[in-house]
């Protein structure tokens, strides 16, 4: 294969474009013939022993390559409107005459540089004008009056930015005046997209100015353009619920403008002033943009408003796309009942509304959340019955539904292994069909395989999948990175590490059992797939040690098979710390005594300034919480450090029955709200020198709210330093919530630790008085309290303290809906000791409880 290197060089003659083609072709012919002659001579001299000569077929093949190259070059010149020296345009390449072949190069070299430069400039300019005519109308280009802005923001259509163009038009003299509104609006609607909010306002103002404020002339294309740009916006972080959202308000203002136009049109008709040539109409696309933005705001009220408005006032009912958007909104809001109702409505409305594969994929995602594998299997059968073509995501979602359903023996109906096996078979079917894969499908496919492997407790495969995916993503980012890779390691790792992948890997560690065999090892296709990933993992581990260009390393133990609990705990700690410290680019979880003292000194001064500047305790508390959040973002990878991954990480030592390690992890990575408030209050009173209203109890724990005056004693100074260090350590801690309290109670049940059970009972009681708990929905509070009470009953049952378990049930029978499944273990234990009286009391509570009474009791408690 022969390659030609192209590019600008110094001290090289410059020729007009067509002549350059003539000489380059002649030069290529000469070089090609010379190459063939040279190769022929070499072959004749060096391959006599091999009896190898160049055949006519080889020559013909190489000539065909040359002809293809020449034709390609001709095509490029044909498509470029080059200007010749006589000022005539030519759209084709003239035949090469004999005179042209014998051009004297020395004469050409004497052509003035100015003429050559002019020819090249004319060529570039004509090409620019041709492309610009396809992007913007001529009148728009004239009023922008800056070709640099147009070229910079519009030439790359994949990253076009219309905001500078619209803003430049806004400050121009004529704006959109004296432009035919119909043709212009058609171009506008199909071209101008993804404007920021201020540019949308400018565009709307110019369009109104173009039609002299006559809203009747504000046509459908104009409405669709404005609504399309509004629908593509993202809500601000501080206004996720859509309350008084400026975009929603603008949408409603546009609808009011449309209503006004209809009213004016009707009045003109009644007065016989003439019927307008074309009345604007609302469309399904406009409704969809309204719904799209409403779902981004998670605003059910606004979504319902737009649906009702379009249906009642404009006669536009939601179509398939609108209803799919509504279902996706319900899915994000965990409103599964409403999603199923809407889905059923789509199936029975009409054939035009019948769900497509996008809608079915959304419903499969809901099945995953509900762990409802029977419904998922029914949906997949419906897809096949209605001849709907499944996508890659359909098979992936089926695998994920089956994986999540296999996590619980009750949900899986005792067939966890069978569900995981079926999930793998869906992925095998996906591989056999070789369907189109979107860029995001690779991630979803890895997540599905990680889910199946993690719930199966297959640590080897989970490690391999995690390593291969993270390595691929890291190296891809480095290969395309425009900055300094070594300097930007923090940013690269933040983009590489993923919380979902980490959570599944931690889940695999938590389900470790050396006695279990992976389901993939039970059939030939599964064995081949598993071996393939393990081989790639092993070879990648070895190659990455010698890769000097892109250094990549994950803190896995240098062994292929983890076979002990100590190894699992060690590796899970290493991977967890590696993720939190953002690929090892930060040093947050470990610090020397000197560094700790420096932090205490630094934050002592900072907290002192907060206390002096704050008007009251609440402002001081807000400043401290803001500083803690800022400190956490600077020192921890907050993308992977969340309550879900922490819950899975803490469950590892529970399942492995390692009590000491569980308590260490719990203490190091969590804090409690009431402890935090006590420390904050102590610091505030100490800095402000406020006398305490409470005397310090010698037997009280350090977390009790006490006042600190001037630190005159060593004990007071140590307490101040302890509190400051407590605040400093919050950068790697997450506040305990109801879910984590439930996990601690499960740990107390597993370890049979009565002291831990009493402590978590008291701590949760204090948590119930804090603002985070009181802000929860009333029904959620009841459900969380009931679940914790159920865990307490399980603890006392396992301890053999049946009277205490029954006491909890009786004391809460008016609040909770006690079902038999919640007291099954207690009932069996009472039957074994033949305590008929307690059994009768227990069954009476289970059979006569009313949930309505529980809500009424909760309401009375809140009133009190």
Curated annotation (Swiss-Prot):
Its main location: mitochondrion. Keywords: Mitochondrion, mRNA processing, mRNA splicing, Repeat, Transit peptide. PPR repeats lie at residues 319-353, 356-390. One of its GO terms (biological process) is mRNA processing. The keyword Hydrolase does not apply. Residues 1-76 form a transit peptide. GO terms for cellular component: mitochondrion. Gene3D superfamilies: Tetratricopeptide repeat domain. InterPro entries: Pentatricopeptide_rpt (IPR002885), TPR-like_helical_dom_sf (IPR011990). Involved in mitochondrial-nuclear incompatibility, a major determinant in reproductive isolation between species, through hybrid incompatibility of Ccm1 and its interacting partner 15S rRNA between yeast species. Binds to mitochondrial small subunit 15S rRNA. Belongs to the CCM1 family. Regulates mitochondrial small subunit maturation by controlling 15S rRNA 5'-end processing. Localizes to the 5' precursor of the 15S rRNA in a position that is subsequently occupied by mS47 in the mature yeast mtSSU. Uses structure and sequence-specific RNA recognition, binding to a single-stranded region of the precursor and specifically recognizing bases -6 to -1. The exchange of Ccm1 for mS47 is coupled to the irreversible removal of precursor rRNA that is accompanied by conformational changes of the mitoribosomal proteins uS5m and mS26. This is Mitochondrial 15S rRNA processing factor CCM1. It comes from Saccharomyces cerevisiae (strain JAY291) (Baker's yeast). The lineage of its organism: Eukaryota, Fungi, Dikarya, Ascomycota, Saccharomycotina.
């Amino acid at each position: 294969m022969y390659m030609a290197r192209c590019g600008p060089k110094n001290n090289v003659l410059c020729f007009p474009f067509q002549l350059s083609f003539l000489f380059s072709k002649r030069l290529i012919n000469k070089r090609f013939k010379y190459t063939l002659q040279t190769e022929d001579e070499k072959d004749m001299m060096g391959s006599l022993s091999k009896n190898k000569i160049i055949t006519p077929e080889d020559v013909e093949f190489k000539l065909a390559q040359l002809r293809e190259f020449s034709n390609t070059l001709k095509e490029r010149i044909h498509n470029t409107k080059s200007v010749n020296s006589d000022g005539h345009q030519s759209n084709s390449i003239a035949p090469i005459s004999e005179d042209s072949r014998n051009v004297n190069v020395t004469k050409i070299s004497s052509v003035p540089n100015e003429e050559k430069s002019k020819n090249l400039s004319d060529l570039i300019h004509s090409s620019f004008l041709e492309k610009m005519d396809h992007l913007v109308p001529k009148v728009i280009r004239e009023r922008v009056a800056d070709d640099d802005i147009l070229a910079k923001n519009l030439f790359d259509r994949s990253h076009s930015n219309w905001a500078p163009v619209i803003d430049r038009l806004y400050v121009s003299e004529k704006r959109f005046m004296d432009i035919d509104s119909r043709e212009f609006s058609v171009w506008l609607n199909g071209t101008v997209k993804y404007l920021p909010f201020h540019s949308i306002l400018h565009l709307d103002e110019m369009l109104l100015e173009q039609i002299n404020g006559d809203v009747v002339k504000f046509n459908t294309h104009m409405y669709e353009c404005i609504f399309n740009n509004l629908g593509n916006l993202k809500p601000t972080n501080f206004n996720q619920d859509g309350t008084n959202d400026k975009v929603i308000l603008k949408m409603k203002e546009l609808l009011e403008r449309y209503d006004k136009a209809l009213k004016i049109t009707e009045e003109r008709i009644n007065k016989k002033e003439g019927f307008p040539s074309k009345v604007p109409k609302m469309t399904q696309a406009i409704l969809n943009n309204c719904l799209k933005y409403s779902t981004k705001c998670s605003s059910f009220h606004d979504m319902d408003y737009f649906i009702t408005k379009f249906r009642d006032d404009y006669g536009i009912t939601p179509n398939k796309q609108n209803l799919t958007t509504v279902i996706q909104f319900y899915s994000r809001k965990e409103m599964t009942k409403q999603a199923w109702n809407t889905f059923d409505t789509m199936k029975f409305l009409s054939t035009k509304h019948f769900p497509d594969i996008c809608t079915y994929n959304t419903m499969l995602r809901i099945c995953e959340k509900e762990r409802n594998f029977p419904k998922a299997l029914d949906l997949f059968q419906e897809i096949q019955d209605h001849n709907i073509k499944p996508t890659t995501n359909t098979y992936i979602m089926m695998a994920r539904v089956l994986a999540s359903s296999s996590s619980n023996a009750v949900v899986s109906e005792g067939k966890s292994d069978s569900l995981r096996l079926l999930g793998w078979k869906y992925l095998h079917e996906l591989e056999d069909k070789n369907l189109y894969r979107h860029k995001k499908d690779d991630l979803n496919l890895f997540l599905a395989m990680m889910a199946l492997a993690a719930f199966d407790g297959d640590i080897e495969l989970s490690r391999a999948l995690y390593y291969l995916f993270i390595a691929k993503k890291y190296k891809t980012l480095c290969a395309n990175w425009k900055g300094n890779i070594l300097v930007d390691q923090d940013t690269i790792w933040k983009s590489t590490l993923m919380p979902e992948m980490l959570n599944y890997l931690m889940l695999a560690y938590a389900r470790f059992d050396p006695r279990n065999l992976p389901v993939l090892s039970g059939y030939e296709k599964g064995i081949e797939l598993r071996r393939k990933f393990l081989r790639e993992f092993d070879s990648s581990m070895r190659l990455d040690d010698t890769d000097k260009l892109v250094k990549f390393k994950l803190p896995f133990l240098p062994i292929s098979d983890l076979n002990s609990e100590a190894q699992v705990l060690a590796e899970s700690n290493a991977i967890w710390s590696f993720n939190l410290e953002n690929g090892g680019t930060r040093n947050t979880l470990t610090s020397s005594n000197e560094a700790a003292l420096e932090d205490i000194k630094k934050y002592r001064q900072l907290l002192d300034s907060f206390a002096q500047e704050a008007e009251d305790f609440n402002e001081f508390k807000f400043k401290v919480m803001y500083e803690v959040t800022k400190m956490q973002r600077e020192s921890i990878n907050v993308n992977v450090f969340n309550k879900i991954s922490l819950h899975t990480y803490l469950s590892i030592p529970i399942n492995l029955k390692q009590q000491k390690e569980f308590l260490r992890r719990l203490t190091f990575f969590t804090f409690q709200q009431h402890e935090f408030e006590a420390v904050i209050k102590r610091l505030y009173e100490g800095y402000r020198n406020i006398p305490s209203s409470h005397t310090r109890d010698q037997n009280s724990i350090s977390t009790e709210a006490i006042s600190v005056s001037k630190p005159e004693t060593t004990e007071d100074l140590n307490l101040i330093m302890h509190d400051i260090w407590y605040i400093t350590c919050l950068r790697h801690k997450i506040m305990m919530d109801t879910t984590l309290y439930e996990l601690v109670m499960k740990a107390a049940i597993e370890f049979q630790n009565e002291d831990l059970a009493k402590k978590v009972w008291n701590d949760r009681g204090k948590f119930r008085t804090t603002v985070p708990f009181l802000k929860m929905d009333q029904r959620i509070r009841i459900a969380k309290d009931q679940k914790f009470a159920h865990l307490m009953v399980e603890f006392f049952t396992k301890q053999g303290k049946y009277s205490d378990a029954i006491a909890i049930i009786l004391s809460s029978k008016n609040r909770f809906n006690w079902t038999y499944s919640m007291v099954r273990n207690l009932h069996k234990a009472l039957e074994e000791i033949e305590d008929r009286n307690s059994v009768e009391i227990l069954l009476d509570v289970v059979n006569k409880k009313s949930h309505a009474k529980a809500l009424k009791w909760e309401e009375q408690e809140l009133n009190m």
